Each structure stands twice: as structure tokens, then as C-alpha cells.
Amino acid sequence: MGTPILDAFNVRVEGSGDKYLVFAHGFGTDQSAWQRVLPYFTRSYKVILYDLVCAGSVNPDHFDFRRYTTLDAYVDDLLNILDSLHVTRCAYVGHSISAMTGMLASIRRPELFSKLILIGASPRFLNDGENYHGGFEQGEIEHVFSAMEANYEAWVNGFAPLAVGADVPTAVREFSRTLFNMRPDISLFVSRTVFNSDLRGILGLVNVPCCIMQTARDMSVPASVATYMKEHIGGKSTVQWLDTEGHLPHLSAPSYLAHQLEIALSQ
């Protein structure tokens, strides 16, 4: 699109509406994850899509292992993209890692975001005693890292159907494709960054209205995490319980998710 950051992250703006809507994908996918959700919004919004630096669709030379040790660098990328497009106000839909990135960005620049819609969001994946159930023990996480390191292909083949959750073979194939597109060392590095992060302390600083979308069964994010986030986010927040399974409803139930997004955006 003419500037280095927009070209580097394959930024696209689709649609003809007056307002901006950002779709930011999560770990293991790229912007194509939104392809069956996108058509529902191009009449009402200018929709901004981009690829995270870790996506297989981005030149891996852009991934600086020293810089991307925390989500702050992903926040920098998001804000630089919006500034390059001269966006002054937008609604934001973030999945997984990008849900938390959106929250961090809203703390830095609250005036930029009218609403955050957070899909499969978690501020902390590890359990913390009796006070917080993130879904994983440290040993389980280390086992995941070891499996990724030992045989990435085998790990993807096992992980993709578990993450999708629902019995939707096309979604499993699509998620597997984008996982395989990632360079394995980058995939492992990002996994370590995400699973070892603890962003519970920033929730109270988020004052932009939030809608937390939580599926019926998500192997990565227990339902209790959605409730925890609602209770700790500083501003107005709601939980929208989705009548579908898995961590990737935009792949497994795109038309249903699009309808739920329309409801959230209208409120």
C-alpha cells in the first residue's frame, strides 16, 4: 500500500463504510482466517486487515527475536499501521494474542478505539494457585514446547483439531495450513512469549468498552477466564457466550460469529 509497514504486514482495507473496523488474527493464523467473516462487514465499514509479524505470510526477516519478547512490540505494529492509514477512531476485533494486543493498545491510545471485541482472550494461560484458573500447569506448557521442538509437523497435526474443537474438517485443514506456513522456530518463540505472559495487572487500566466473546468449550481458554476478565477490566465490559465450540469460531462457525459480531458492534 505504499509505505514499508503497510507492505511488510500485507495491510488491506476492504469495504466502503464510513467507520473503520480492524480484524486482527491470532497465533497460528493470518488475515485469511477472517475471509468468510469479512463479507458481512464491507458494506458498513472500511475493514482493516493485516498479518502479524509472526505469520507465515510475512517475510521472516521482519521478525526480530530481541524485539518481540513481549506483546508491546505487537502493540507498536498495530498503532503504526493505524497511524500510517490516518485512522483516528476504529472498532477493533482481536483474536487470541491480538485480543490482548488490542487491550494494551487501548491503554496507550484510548481515544483511538470505540470498542474492543475480544475473541478467545486470556491475560494468563497458567494456573495461579486457587485464585486463578488459566487452564494450564507449567509442566503441561513445557510439554507443549518440547513437542513443538521435537517434531513440529506432528505437533501441528495433533494441536489443530484440538484447537478447532468442533467437528469441522475444513477449519482444521485451514488452521493446519497457516500453522505449517509459520517458521517452526518463530512459532515456538511466539508460543513461549504468549504462554509465559501475565497481563492480569493491566486489565484495570482498560477503559474502552469491551465485549468478551467466549465459546462453549475452548481448550486454550476456560470459561472462567472470560468471567475473570469481565470482573477486572476497568471500563464497561460484557461477556457474549457463543453457542459454538473451539478456539477459532471465525474458522469453524464464520456466519454465526459474524452475526454475533454484528450484535456486539450495534450495542
From Swiss-Prot:
InterPro entries: AB_hydrolase_1, AB_hydrolase_fold. Keywords: Cytoplasm, Hydrolase, Nucleus. Disruption phenotype: Reduced plant height and extensive vegetative branching from both basal and aerial nodes. GO terms for cellular component: cytoplasm; nucleus. It is found in: Cytoplasm; Nucleus. GO terms for molecular function: hydrolase activity. Involved in strigolactone signaling pathway. Functions downstream of strigolactone synthesis, as a component of hormone signaling and as an enzyme that participates in the conversion of strigolactones to the bioactive form. Binds and hydrolyzes the synthetic strigolactone analog GR24 and its enantiomers in vitro. Forms a stable covalent complex with the D-ring of strigolactone, which is essential for hormone bioactivity. The D-ring is attached to His-247 of the catalytic triad. Belongs to the AB hydrolase superfamily. This is Strigolactone esterase RMS3. It comes from Pisum sativum (Garden pea). The gene is RMS3.
